[in-house]
Amino acid sequence: MAKKSMIIKQQREPKFAVRAYTRCERCGRPHSVLRKFKLCRICFRELAYKGQIPGVKKASW
């Protein structure tokens, strides 16, 4: 779980555009965030396995 202070700090508009970064909307993790879903890889995997993300299914080949 991310620190609440860092989550609040990230929500503010940065002084410079390059300082902006993505965070998982579910847990607040700053790394490995899928932009399309706004979720980190861990949360994405959990929700995908439960079938809570529409249009996403486990790949098999």
Curated annotation (Swiss-Prot):
Molecular functions (GO terms): rRNA binding; structural constituent of ribosome; zinc ion binding
InterPro entries hit by this protein: Ribosomal_uS14, Ribosomal_uS14_bact, Ribosomal_uS14_CS, Ribosomal_uS14_sf
GO biological processes: translation
Positions of Zn(2+) binding: 24, 27, 40, 43
Keyword match RNA-binding: yes
A cellular component term, taken from the record's GO annotations: small ribosomal subunit
SUPFAM superfamilies per UniProt: Glucocorticoid receptor-like (DNA-binding domain)
Cofactor: Zn(2+)
Cofactor note: Binds 1 zinc ion per subunit.
Disulfide bridge partners, by residue number: none
Keywords: Metal-binding, Ribonucleoprotein, Ribosomal protein, RNA-binding, rRNA-binding, Zinc
RNA-binding among keywords: yes
Top-level division of the source organism's lineage: Bacteria
Role summary: Binds 16S rRNA, required for the assembly of 30S particles and may also be responsible for determining the conformation of the 16S rRNA at the A site.
Subunit structure, as described in the record: Part of the 30S ribosomal subunit. Contacts proteins S3 and S10.
Family: Belongs to the universal ribosomal protein uS14 family. Zinc-binding uS14 subfamily.
Name by which UniProt lists this protein: Small ribosomal subunit protein uS14
Organism: Brevibacillus brevis (strain 47 / JCM 6285 / NBRC 100599)
Gene (name only): rpsZ
